[in-house]
Amino acid sequence: MQARLNRLTDAPVGVVGAGRLGGALAAALRAEGIPVEGPMGRGEVPAGCQAILLCVPDSETEAAAQTVAGAAPFVGHVSGATPLAALEPATRRGAEGFGLHPLQTFAPAPASVELAGAGCAVAGSSPAALALARELALVLGMEPFEIDDDGRAAYHAAASMASNFLLALEAAAERVAGAAGLDEEEARALLAPLVRTTVENWIALGPERALTGPVARGDEQTVRAQRAAVEAAAPDLLPVFDSLLSETRSLAGRRVPA
C-alpha cells in the first residue's frame, strides 16, 4: 500500500545531516512555515515526521537510509548523482523514496544561500513520492524538473562542469595573471566583471553568439602569444589551455555570421 501524502504543515519534515546543505534546507523550510525536526547528526532518527531528508555525502546515503528505515512514510536524498536505489534499506521497510537536488552551490560563504529561482531535480518511487518532492521544491521557490536514474550521472556532470570546473578555470586564470604582475586578489577583482558579463551573455545569447576574443576574430597571432605566455608562466596549465582552445575553435566554427 502506498504512503499517503499529507499537507506539508501537518507533520514535520526531518533533516538528517547538519552540514551546509542540511542546515540551509532546514532553515529555508522553517522560513516557509514548514515544521522541521533537525538538522540532526548522522545516526540520529527524527521522530513523528511525514518525510525525512538525508543530507549526507553520497557514499553514506545507503547507511543513512538504513538508520531511518521505518521512521517515516517518505524518505528522500538530496544527491544529484545517487540513484533512488540507494534508499532501498528504507523502501524495503515500506517507505516511498524520493530525490530532491537543488541545482545550486552551497559554499561556506557569509551570504545566505538563494534557493528561489534555482532548478531542482526531483524523482520519486511512486506518484505520491514524486508529488512530495515537487511540493517541497515549489515551497522553497525552486523550479522542479524530473531526472530519472539513467540520466543522473550526465545531469550531475553538467552541473559540475558549469560550477566546479568554472572555479578551476578561474583559479588557472589567476595563476597566469600573476605573470602580468597581479596577485590573486587583484586578479580576482579585475577579472570578476568580465566573468559576470560573460556568464550573463551566455544566458541571454547562448554560447555561440556570446563568444568574443581572438579565437572568435580569427586572430591566430594573438592566440600564439597567449599560448607562449601560459607556457612560460604555468607550463602545467598548457594542456588545459590547448584543450579549451580546441573547444573554443569548435564553438567559433558554429557561429552564424551576423
What residues fall within each predicted segment?
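NAD(P)-dependent Rossmann-like dehydrogenase/reductase catalytic/cofactor-binding core
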Residues: 2, 7, 189-258
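Phosphate-coordination loops involved in phosphoryl transfer and adenosine-cofactor binding
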Residues: 9-12, 72, 117
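Internal alpha-helical scaffold of NAD(P)-dependent oxidoreductase catalytic cores
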Residues: 25, 32, 112-204
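Rossmann-like NAD(P)(H) cofactor-binding subdomain of soluble oxidoreductases
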Residues: 27, 42-111
